[in-house]
């Protein structure tokens, strides 16, 4: 998704009640990471990243600890599922979910699409080739400066860890690499002792499209319904 869409999405997230919307999604990511790789962050890079992202959203330590403990309980019986859909104006949508009840999740998603004329869920794999999967890391520019590193120094240091692109956006530095380089890039940040502000695996459209304000307003109604579902932890579109 393009920067304009991300700006609107960021503005929407600020309006969310974190306890009711953001925290449950972050908790699911922590629980699944602990379930897959163990409850010790020192030996589980995926869990370290999930905790890092939770702390970036000011999630309380008690909530984080509870999410880790949940991995060994019946509540921790989560699975990762991806669904794909299409909407009007050529909009393509990929929804990454974490759920303990896939039947409930797909039923809810179908209801959102059914309420939107011209929108539909499509078979998995139909849209995969329209997106590139990337590892995306964010850090603060002043943290780089504190290490007495220039952007060129940082880029050179992380190339061997899988860096493909470095971008400066306001007070942040965004690092992108191949999807399979996520663990390696994480190790690169750790080797530099550079704090990570946020880390994620993202899907970036190969051919983004632009919508006018009216089209965007109509499309956002569907996207808002999807994002508000607790089982949906990430949403990607081809909107520029």
Swiss-Prot record:
Annotated compartments: Cytoplasm
InterPro entries, A to Z: Integrase-like_N (IPR017856), TACO1_YebC-like_2nd/3rd_dom (IPR048300), TACO1_YebC_N (IPR049083), Transcrip_reg_TACO1-like (IPR002876), Transcrip_reg_TACO1-like_dom3 (IPR026564), YebC-like (IPR029072)
A Gene Ontology term for the protein's cellular component: cytosol
Region forming the signal peptide: none
Chief location: cytoplasm
Annotated keywords: Cytoplasm, DNA-binding, Transcription, Transcription regulation
GO biological process, one term: regulation of DNA-templated transcription
GO-annotated molecular function: DNA binding
Claim: Signal is one of the keywords in the record: no
Similarity-based family: Belongs to the TACO1 family.
PANTHER family with a match to the protein in the record: TRANSCRIPTIONAL REGULATORY PROTEIN YEBC-RELATED (PTHR12532:SF6), TRANSLATIONAL ACTIVATOR OF CYTOCHROME C OXIDASE 1 (PTHR12532)
Official protein name in the record: Probable transcriptional regulatory protein HP_0162
Taxonomic source organism: Helicobacter pylori (strain ATCC 700392 / 26695) (Campylobacter pylori)
């Amino acid at each position: 998704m393009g920067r304009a869409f991300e700006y609107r999405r960021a503005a929407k997230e600020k309006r969310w009640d974190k306890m009711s919307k953001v925290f449950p999604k972050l908790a699911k990511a922590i629980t699944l990471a602990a379930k897959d790789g163990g409850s010790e962050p020192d030996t589980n890079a995926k869990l370290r990243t999930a905790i890092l992202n939770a702390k970036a959203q000011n999630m309380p330590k008690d909530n984080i600890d509870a999410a880790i403990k949940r991995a060994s309980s019946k509540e921790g019986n989560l699975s990762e599922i991806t669904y794909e859909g299409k909407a009007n104006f050529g909009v393509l949508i990929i929804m990454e979910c974490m759920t303990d009840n896939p039947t409930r999740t797909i039923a809810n998603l179908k209801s959102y699409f059914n309420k939107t004329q011209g929108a539909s869920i499509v078979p998995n794999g139909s849209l995969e080739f329209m997106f590139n999967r990337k590892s995306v890391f964010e850090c603060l520019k002043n943290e780089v400066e504190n290490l007495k590193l220039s952007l060129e120094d940082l880029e050179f240091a992380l190339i061997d860890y899988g860096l493909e692109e470095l971008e400066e956006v306001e007070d942040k530095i965004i690092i992108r690499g191949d999807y399979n380089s996520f663990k390696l890039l994480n190790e690169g940040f750790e080797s530099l002792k550079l704090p990570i502000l946020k880390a994620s695996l993202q899907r970036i459209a190969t051919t983004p499209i632009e919508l006018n304000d009216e089209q965007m307003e109509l499309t956002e109604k569907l996207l808002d319904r999807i994002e508000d579902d607790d089982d949906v932890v990430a949403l990607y579109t081809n909107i520029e």
